[in-house]
Amino acid sequence: MAHKKAGGSSRNGRDSEAKRLGVKRFGGETVLAGSIIVRQRGTKFHAGTNVGLGKDHTLFATATGKILFEVKGPLNRKYVSIVAE
């Protein structure tokens, strides 16, 4: 005879870990070449002058300078650029 009541089998109880996406360096900040500026899924922000786009859509500085966020173009896209100092 069982001395414990039968336990239920829940189908919950798991979650994926956070991916730490978002803006890592903000407008006006000085960054070194190679610094990650934005981690994103898709192109919420587009690469402007002196900014590269990684295969996972990460934006990174290709030159040392100050970050400039701007909205431009007919589709009002958000661009991230580096103004070289």
Swiss-Prot record:
It holds the Pfam family Ribosomal_L27. The gene is rpmA. Belongs to the bacterial ribosomal protein bL27 family. One of its GO terms (cellular component) is cytosolic large ribosomal subunit. The lineage of its organism: Bacteria, Pseudomonadati, Pseudomonadota, Gammaproteobacteria, Aeromonadales. It comes from Aeromonas hydrophila subsp. hydrophila (strain ATCC 7966 / DSM 30187 / BCRC 13018 / CCUG 14551 / JCM 1027 / KCTC 2358 / NCIMB 9240 / NCTC 8049). Residues 1-21 are annotated as: Disordered. One of its GO terms (biological process) is translation. The keyword Ribonucleoprotein applies. SUPFAM superfamilies: Ribosomal L27 protein-like. GO terms for molecular function: structural constituent of ribosome. This is Large ribosomal subunit protein bL27. Keywords: Ribonucleoprotein, Ribosomal protein. InterPro entries: Ribosomal_bL27, Ribosomal_bL27_CS.
